[in-house]
Amino acid sequence: MLYSNFKSLNKKISKVGLGCVTFGREITEDESIRLLDVAVENGINLFNTSYYYSDGISEKIIGKFFKIKKNRKDITIVSKIHGDLSKKTIEKCIHESLIRMNTDHIDYYGVTHDPNTNLDEVLEVVSRFQKEGKILRVACNNYDISMLKSSKKIQEINNFSKFGLLETVYNVLYRGAEKDLINYCDLENIDIISYSPLGAGFITGKYKNGKVSPKKTRFDIKPSHKDIYFKDVFFETMNKLENLSNETNFSLIDLALSWVLSRDFLSNVLIGVRDISHIKKPINILENPINEIILNEINEITKNNLDLIDP
């Protein structure tokens, strides 16, 4: 396993993080705990979850794992909240998340954008929790550059805690983060972790333009993913990547994961899992990287996606 130095915590954290969105939704509690165990055995020390994943079951499973293994101190927890970000809701959610996960603190706690709540209120609440030690660093999810800058002004004026982490989508199809987020976060010492390296499975090539989604796949379970990825420009990009896959004898998964994992500006790449192979694959890629020539070809094929607005 390769490890990144997270500037915001001054801590070595695995380049691959375990996304826990499937826990309690697509896989059982026992299966989830087994995957957490395998992840730790293979050097992964970051778990990413949310107050709302599987109506709280995801966090509860993580808490049960900590209770069994007694290894909370070895793991970095990233959790978050979306939707209603009123003071009352944030306070309730953080307190409940701490109880669910059997912990006295959350390493990174992320907030999204709530158009119905004043940003000052959101930043004040999470800052207070950081100062109390219940959050080590405040994080944000899917913020664009204008939201980051607006937040910074409020944080500086009010002496609120600044963001230490940005969680954002990033893959061969959605490359918008490269336009301005990367440089800004580097200057502000904000670590970046990315999610959806395979586009919720779209980048595996299993979905075809005009065809019905295969049963029990992510797009069948959660049809809203179609609004994000079923675009003509993405199907065209996938056709080009499939040609490269055939030419190089590397699968689409190998190509997509290798490219994302090679991006130095990402402190961590989150991998959603349903079985052990989903953990082993990115680790194997880190240990046996694809050569620069092929990575550059992927870069060239997908460069037009820099101008696309992230979902």
Feature names for model-found ranges:
Residues 1-74, 131:
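N-terminal binding-site loop/beta-alpha segment at the start of enzyme catalytic domains
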Residues 15, 46, 105-108, 137, ...:
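Residues at the N-termini of beta-strands
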Residues 19-30, 80-88, 112, 117:
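Active-site mouth loops of central-metabolism enzymes
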Residues 27-39, 86-100, 148-153:
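Short, acidic/polar
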Residues 38, 42, 100-101, 133, ...:
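Structural motif
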Residues 73-84, 108-112, 167-169:
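A short, structured active-site edge motif that brings together acidic residues
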Residues 99-118:
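Active-site groove signature of glycoside hydrolases
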Residues 114-302, 309:
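Beta/alpha (TIM)-barrel catalytic core signal, keyed to glycine-rich beta->alpha loops juxtaposed to Asp/Glu
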